[in-house]
Amino acid sequence: MEAPERIPAPSEWHPFIGGAARTVKLWLAAVLAGLLGAAATQGFRTLIKGVEWLATGHMGGLVAAAESITPLHRALLGAFGGLGAGLVLHWGLRWAARGPDGAEHVDYIEAAREGHYLLNDRTTLMRSISALLSVGTGASIGKEGPMVQLSAWFASWLARFLPLTDDERNAILVCGIASGIGCAYHAPIAGVVFVLELALGFFARHTIAPVLIAAGTSSALIYWLVEPQPLYVMPTVALVPTSLGVAIAAGVISGGLGWAFIEMLERARKIFGRIDSLPFRLGLGGVIAGLIAAAVPDVWGNGYSVVSEVLQGNVAWHWVAV
């Protein structure tokens, strides 16, 4: 007769119960990180619209706002927006230098890679305000970067107050990054893959489930708050036998043009880097961008609407070059 299966004594249940409780606690924290990430990105979008309305009296998108004002108005907004962003950074870095973390900015990707969870509060706040002024007045720096930074910052604050281990707190920071990317680009899966593989460089066992939960939570909330549309309007393309050759040629040409554009950006960065004064440096950049916008209002913003027009075949190549 076989011996009956041994039932663990209650005193032996604690390790299993404790492990399950820690896992559930981390998952609930990931839900909170996702909610905060959605709030951060949507809040930043709202603030951008507020700055846009104050600057132009329009809230229907940056390109539409640029087209609704005069060329002189566009040029002045570029100059004053750049100057304002520079002044915020100039005074903000002085204020940050008096804080406990100094004026050295902590990049959220580097913090995640190194297993940390603390970010520099003052530099993060000042950079976000500076970006808000720039984006709201038409600068083409992109709003997605500050959104992800704010989402990571909110997650960092959440991790500080929860009874977690340092590894779990770092996982919550990673959750904030994934939530921000998912909300900013309406692509939660891309946010998960970017953080776990491209940013961290590995799939950490204890972060996979929380990151999936956070990205899903933030995207669900964003989809409930707004009705996200595809970033680009894709046309219907009929494939023919020569399509593959055209695609290969376009890839080679685009790769070369992309390399040349990056080289131009690096050279411009070095030239502007010689200017020590942040207000003057950003103000000068704003003047140049404003003068271009005075002639071509489509350069306002990060180019989503223009790229969609290009995909539809409604924009000539010389406007794309501008």
Predicted regions and their residues:
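Alpha-helical transmembrane segments and immediately membrane-proximal extracytoplasmic
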Residues: M1-V322
